[in-house]
Amino acid sequence: EYIGDNIFFVPVDARWDKIVKASLTAEIGVVVDAAMEALEKENKQLKGILPKNYARPELDKRRLGNVIDIFENNLHFTGSEARDVLGRVYEYFLGEFAREEGKKGGEFYTPSCVVRTIVEVIQPYKGKIFDPACGSGGMFVQSSKFIERHRGNINQISVYGQELNSNTWRLAQMNLAICGIEANFGDSSGDSFHDDKHPFLKADFVMANPPFNISKWGGDQLRDDPRWQYGIPPEGNANFAWMQHMLYHLADKGRIGLVLANGSLSSQQGT
């Protein structure tokens, strides 16, 4: 047991050996739920984030136990490499979930090759990093990997994110906790346009893959918003609003890396 930077504490009731011992019993769901509750109690950054519904009757406890056995019997790593392995496993499952969801999956997951390209271009070595449509937090994870590859100090960055979907907001919190990255995602999920969680933030790096061509984004309620420094965005398309929102939160001499639909800079759609 120890305390260190960017480490969350795993209490006795949440430790892997206790979960494994119960994996083939009918009580495995109760044990996993208790583990989640214990983790949240000891780690304030996880409070209200972890799922605690594994004891529900409709969940097949044998299948849950089999999944635990797969991890126990096939993933072997030391403490020093555990975080990296768990992070890659989590990223793999996020990618699989996104593929299963099809187009909808793109709302919470950006392919790692796209994220790596953005990170390599803007090079977020140190400073404040912001993603106003952060999904599951992939931009931040790749930023931390970039810093590690270049022998930088992860403690020299501050991470800020916002996500509209409450379930995806929780995924991002878990993703960054697993990877040992401290982050400020606001006190809840929220709409970046109508409920800006970081209204005074000026970030050194802004990275995002916001949803394309959103037509119903409530632009008619924000016509006098101070973020629209380059003109009022069309009410029928949020692309220009996303760009201005990011520019508004960009510090002097900051850098932006974003993914938007073709023609976002020239389209008259929605005017």
State each model region's role:
Residues I118, W169, D187, P234-T271:
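Conserved Class I SAM-dependent methyltransferase catalytic core
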Residues K104-A208, N213-W217, L222-D224, Q229, ...:
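Conserved S-adenosyl-L-methionine
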Residues E1-Y125, N184-K197:
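Non-catalytic, mostly N-terminal accessory regions of nucleic-acid modification and defense proteins
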Residues R63, V85, V89, T110, ...:
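Helical mechanochemical/support elements of P-loop NTPase systems and associated helical scaffolds
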